[in-house]
Amino acid sequence: MKAIAYYTSLPINDPQALQDIELPEPVAGPRDLLVEVKAISVNPVDTKVRQNVSPEGGAAKVLGWDAAGVVKAVGSEVSLFKAGDKVYYAGSIARAGANSELHVVDERIVGHMPKSLGFAEAAALPLTAITAWELLFERLQIGEGNAAEGQSLLIVGAAGGVGSILTQLASQLTALKVIGTASRAQTRSWVEALGADLVIDHSQPLSEELKRAGQPNVTHVASLTQTDLHFAQLVEALAPQGKLALIDDPKALDITQLKRKSLSLHWEFMYTRSLFETADMLEQHKLLNRVAELIDAGTLKTTVGEHFGTINATN
């Protein structure tokens, strides 16, 4: 089968950084689906892996952890899907990526594709949707449909991929007051259109921006970018016993700043379940199906950016 891979970590402008190659067709394990890949999306994780992980023994490493396609075959213990089903998923970083004609993935982290979307639009969703969903409902433990009086969520980086889904989930499915951050007129308008109640400028001190907007503090924070830069401001902005969740990789955080207010810190990494094969892996299947229902109902919208055409090393 055709695939896109790399053999050594090189700058992306190097002609050998990514190569079109031929690989044997993968074989589905007992809980696996063999998927004919129709579309993939590119995420920061692709760049991080390519820059930091060199394949061993001259092997080719295939990237790609957001995909949509059609089930070609199923493993002996598969119960959730059948051949011909349209699916979407983010896969596992412990296995080969989906930048290939065929791909194997555990059924427990796969969802039925939204009926109203094409493959490219669907492939843009899984990683960001899983991250946003787990952060909101599992790490921050926000309940659907209600929130205690005065509860609020500050989303730092609300116009990005995860932020765009998170803003929609929080505004559509909870009673939280949603405050997003954006620094340009275009992104401010985007975040407002996604349902944020307030939009503040993250190029300015966040606690001061909140006060100017009439929001002296917040009960929850989702820090999606530059957490180390904003950390002191986020601690100041959080109400006592508030919760801070993050997804990025800050170099160092002085968490002793959290003690005085009894603040809690939560990390969200959507690959944890598949990486460690946790007992609740099936939750990602369930949430992807729920996201598909919300997309088809018009409650959520996809965040596909630019379509690059055929899947190959050049693109």
Q: In which residue ranges do the predicted regions lie?
A:
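Glycine-rich beta-strand-centered segment in the early N-terminal region that forms part
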Residues: P24-S41, Q51-A94
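Residue-level marker of beta-strand positions
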Residues: D85-K86, L102, S152, K243
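A structural motif shared across PLP-dependent enzymes of the aminotransferase-like
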Residues: A94-E107
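Short, glycine/polar-rich helix-capping loops at beta-to-alpha or helix-loop-helix junctions
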Residues: A98-N99, S183-W190, A252-I255
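C-terminal boundary of histidine-terminating zinc-finger modules
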Residues: A120
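Mid-domain Rossmann-like dinucleotide-binding core that forms the NAD(H)/NADP(H) cofactor-binding site
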Residues: A123-Q204
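Glycine-rich cofactor phosphate-binding loops and adjacent beta1-alpha1 units
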Residues: E144-N146, L194, L198-E268
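C-terminal substrate-binding/catalytic core of Rossmann-like NAD(P)-dependent dehydrogenases/reductases
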Residues: Q257-F308
